[in-house]
């Protein structure tokens, strides 16, 4: 087994699939709850989400029903919340890294959770073009067999969020500004030029094959032992 694959097995990997925005086009709209169940974490009890008042307080500030910051459903937000709590409780060394930021909702949730656990010394690295998603390649085919390039043309406006807007959203959390690192540009150009030495939690949400592959090649080796890797759209694209 190649070294990268061996190391892969040593880490906790949270694989969540399905991105809501990818089913809003080309007549793919369907009942969200029934579609989500096919990809749900079988170990996740929804009652836990409702009963967890600390999570609900944070989710109310970033969740899709309360704001414009994220399209992630409550289950995925809770997975991220629990992952952040895990790395703090287990004293996993390293910073928080997100590739593919959109409006900053997931990063805001991470920041608020870190603050809840008095962990504001960790840096949060946010990689994005802040000008929209780069054009998909022929490898980017979704679970319905639809070339993502076709959907991308419809989504371009939705996916385009400026750096200034994300900075404003992140600032609203109260997390120390000096510990929020915004890295603007395509990840193929910015990584590994600007990267932390160690990563406690790596969240990948750039959707596309080429960018995700590049991120894993350069950032995965920096994930601390027993750290967390979240691939947001794992299973949604054939690549």
Locations of regions flagged by a protein language model:
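Conserved alpha-helix/loop element of class I SAM-dependent methyltransferases that forms part
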Residues: 78-92
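N-terminal auxiliary segments of SAM/dcSAM-dependent transferases
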Residues: 1-44
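S-adenosylmethionine/decaboxylated-SAM
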Residues: 5-15, 46-48, 53-74, 90-239
């Amino acid at each position: 087994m190649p070294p990268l694959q061996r190391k892969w097995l040593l880490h906790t990997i949270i694989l969540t699939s399905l991105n809501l925005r990818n089913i809003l086009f080309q007549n793919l709209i369907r009942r969200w709850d029934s579609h989500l169940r096919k990809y749900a974490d079988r170990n996740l009890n929804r009652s836990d989400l409702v009963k967890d008042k600390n999570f609900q307080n944070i989710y109310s500030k970033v969740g899709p029903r309360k704001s414009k910051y994220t399209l992630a459903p409550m289950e995925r937000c809770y997975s991220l919340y629990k992952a952040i709590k895990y790395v703090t409780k287990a004293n996993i060394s390293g910073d928080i890294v997100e590739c593919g930021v959109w409006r900053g909702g997931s990063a805001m949730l991470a920041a608020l959770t870190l603050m809840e656990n008095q962990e504001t010394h960790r840096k949060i690295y946010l990689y994005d073009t802040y000008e929209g998603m780069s054009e998909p390649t022929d490898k980017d085919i979704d679970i319905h067999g639809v070339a993502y390039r076709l959907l991308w043309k419809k989504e371009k406006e939705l996916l385009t969020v400026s750096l200034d807007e994300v900075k404003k959203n992140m600032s609203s959390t109260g997390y120390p500004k000096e510990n929020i690192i915004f890295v603007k540009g395509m990840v193929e150009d910015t990584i590994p030029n600007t990267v932390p030495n160690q990563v406690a939690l790596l969240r990948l949400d750039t959707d596309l094959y080429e960018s995700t592959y590049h991120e894993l090649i350069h950032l995965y080796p920096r994930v601390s032992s027993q750290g967390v890797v979240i691939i947001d759209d794992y299973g949604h694209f054939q690549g």
